[in-house]
Amino acid sequence: MLANLPATRLANISPKTPVRKQPYTTDISGKLILLGTGTSVGVPALGCGCPVCTSENPKNHRTRSSAIFGLPEGNLLVDTSPDLRTQLLREKIGIVHSVIYTHEHSDHVMGFDDLRLFQFYLGTPVPVYCRKIVEKRLRKAFDYAFDDQPTTHQGATPSIALHSIDREPIQILGETVTLIPLRHGPRFDVLGFRIGNVAYCTDVSEIPNDSWDLLQDLDTLVLDGLRYEPHATHLSLAQATEISQRLAPRQTYFTHCACRMDYDEVNAVLPDGIELGYDGLQIDLV
């Protein structure tokens, strides 16, 4: 029994399970997976007893919005939601090769610290792509990951390599990522992303004139669709549906959905080719 061994003996015992040098992970190549499809407070929302928040339908349980692309050279994570660890464990995804951010709001960045483990698997800092305003928020919220003070041990803080992005397409993990400028209410700019004929556009209230052409000829559009009623910084269900019908992709999925948006009830009234997304939904990139 270990409980009866003296400390000198315990110090020389090694665990039977070796340290894993390669991650235990599912191959998601050629897929876009919606890790989270919920609004900033998630669904169920704390203290809410509405039929959706108390629903037993797992498609009504929505973690904070995030997604991951399985690209030719690895997994590209979109945003680090506060639920990131839970999301990756649920999907059995054990490694992130790069991260790209839509914007700087807390429900999209506060899982940043969960990137710590990936430096061990990659053997290098995790490449992170973001606009300057997002970098500023990361440096402020996670100052310990950026200061000059030596860490006590490897893995004590996230190890990342920042890359600034703005509007020009970029190459990440063997694919071209098209950046789509979007509006998130009167004060905030966000980025959507297009890879091939699939586009991911969350936290949207308006598509600027110059961005419509970037969203033509899509197979799949993932688009903000917060709730039935209008909102200052998000698309309502009617607004999102109108945009989808104008762009006419083969399939649209709404994300960043609030409670009271029952999965089955909303889908029953949406036009053909438009549905609510749900946590864990897999979309083909080909």
Go through each PLM region and give its residues:
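Cap/insert and terminal regions of metallo-dependent hydrolase folds
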Residues: 205-286
